[in-house]
Swiss-Prot record:
TNase-like domain sequence ranges: 66-199
Listed name of the protein: SPbeta prophage-derived endonuclease YokF
UniProt cross-references to Pfam families, sorted A to Z: Excalibur, SNase
pH influence on activity: Optimum pH is 7.0-8.0.
Keyword hit for Lipoprotein: yes
Length: 296
């Protein structure tokens, strides 16, 4: 009987020890797995935070402006100015926008072109002038600087777009830093039908349609009256005759236009050069393509 009881006790003790061993094993296993799960969660959290930080850094980098101080020489038209940059006078073509023409050779004055030119002149003369370059080429094929223009920290391009005096155009990667904002500004003016957007079909993907008749007439009147000043009169003295002969040798006047052999001859009569609307203007003498020939 004692042997039976002892055997039963031994069996019971064996079962108890096995159960304890199983519980301890599960406990150890759980303890091992729990830190791993916690580590995975922490890693995912860190990755999300890292992604957010990178996105924020990219946004800050995009918004960062490296502005360069320049001095205004003069406004050319609605989307072009001349400035002194690095000690030289340079032509600046505004990035990502286009305004109606006023001085393009062999082209008429387009509606709202004069308005855009006038507004641009007002803006660039109103405060501290600065330029911002994009990632791509800083000059176009004509040698003009390509830049975003600011006056007292405010974008001139955005102002012209918001007022309906310019359209978004000439979009070439990678010079597209502000394309999204510019399109919003353009849409704002378009929705309100401001200036260039007030005429259906006036703005196209290639530019603008139509000419200003009144401006064309004014130019014709100015050109037809010009030859009268160069008509030879009866010489009163030998010096006057000599001057007339010199003018005839350096230029030819035909049908309201004046033709000079080169800029040297042209400057004898027009020391500061002539704009594209002038009878003596020739595109071959406009080397920087700013619609002004033989300027000093």
């Amino acid at each position: 009987m004692k042997k039976v009881l002892l055997g039963f006790a031994a069996f019971t003790l064996s079962l108890s020890l096995a159960a304890c061993s199983s519980n301890d094993s599960e406990k150890v296993s759980t303890e091992k797995e729990t830190p791993q799960a916690s580590t995975d969660v922490e890693k995912k959290t860190e990755q999300k935070e890292s992604t957010k930080e990178k996105t924020a850094d990219k946004s800050k980098e995009k918004d960062k402006k490296e502005l360069v101080d320049v001095t205004l020489d003069r406004a050319v038209d609605g989307d072009t100015i001349k400035v002194t940059y690095n000690g030289n006078v340079d032509t600046v073509r505004y990035l990502l926008i286009d305004t109606p023409e006023t001085k393009k050779p062999n082209s008429c004055v387009q509606p709202y072109g004069e308005d855009a030119s006038k507004r641009n002149k007002e803006l660039v003369n109103s405060g501290k002038l600065q330029l911002e370059f994009d990632k791509g080429d800083r000059r176009d094929k004509y040698g003009r600087l390509l830049a975003y223009v600011y006056v007292d920290g405010k974008s001139v391009q955005e102002t012209l777009l918001k007022e309906g005096l310019a359209r978004v155009a000439y979009v070439y990667e990678p010079n597209t830093k502000y394309i999204d904002q510019f399109k919003k500004d353009e849409q704002e003016a378009k929705s309100e039908k401001l200036s260039i957007w007030s005429k259906n079909g006036y703005v196209t993907d290639r530019g603008f349609n139509g000419c200003v008749k009144e401006k064309t007439t004014a130019v014709k009147k100015a050109t037809t009256s010009k030859p009268a000043a160069t008509q030879p009169t009866t010489p009163k003295a030998s010096s006057e005759t000599s001057t007339t002969t010199e003018k005839e040798a350096s230029s030819e006047t035909t049908g309201g236009t004046e033709t000079f052999k080169n800029c040297t001859e042209l400057r004898k009569k027009y020391p500061n050069g002539v704009p594209s609307s002038h009878p003596a203007y020739q595109s071959k003498m406009d080397r920087d393509h700013d619609n002004y020939a033989c300027e000093r």
